[in-house]
Amino acid sequence: MNTVRVTFLLVFVLAVSLGQADKDENRMEMQEKTEQGKSYLDFAENLLLQKLEELEAKLLEEDSEESRNSRQKRCIGEGVPCDENDPRCCSGLVCLKPTLHGIWYKSYYCHKK
């Protein structure tokens, strides 16, 4: 019985001491892998940053080429009174004289074409 205990204790001590060595080796391997992973991540990050900068430059060029006068000015929506001489109805609408309703306010309203 005593020899079994001594043998078990000896095996246990060896397992613990060798396990610690394996743990240190594993820690070193993990540090090396994380350093390699960081370098890969830095490389990928730099590539992504370059692509984003190129896209941003293209978008800024397109914005600078677009004129401010090319945008549609404020417009009047459907069913809103408009001026016959200066109709500012939104696209798809025309300034027409109403047939039945609206005769008591202004004589022209924006309606669908």
Curated annotation (Swiss-Prot):
Residues 22-74 form a propeptide. Probable ion channel inhibitor. The presence of a 'disulfide through disulfide knot' structurally defines this protein as a knottin. Its main location: secreted. Disulfide bonds join 75-90, 82-95, 89-110. Residues 1-21 form the signal peptide. The keyword Signal applies. It comes from Cyriopagopus hainanus (Chinese bird spider). This is U11-theraphotoxin-Hhn1r. Keywords: Disulfide bond, Ion channel impairing toxin, Knottin, Secreted, Signal, Toxin. GO terms for molecular function: sodium channel inhibitor activity; toxin activity.
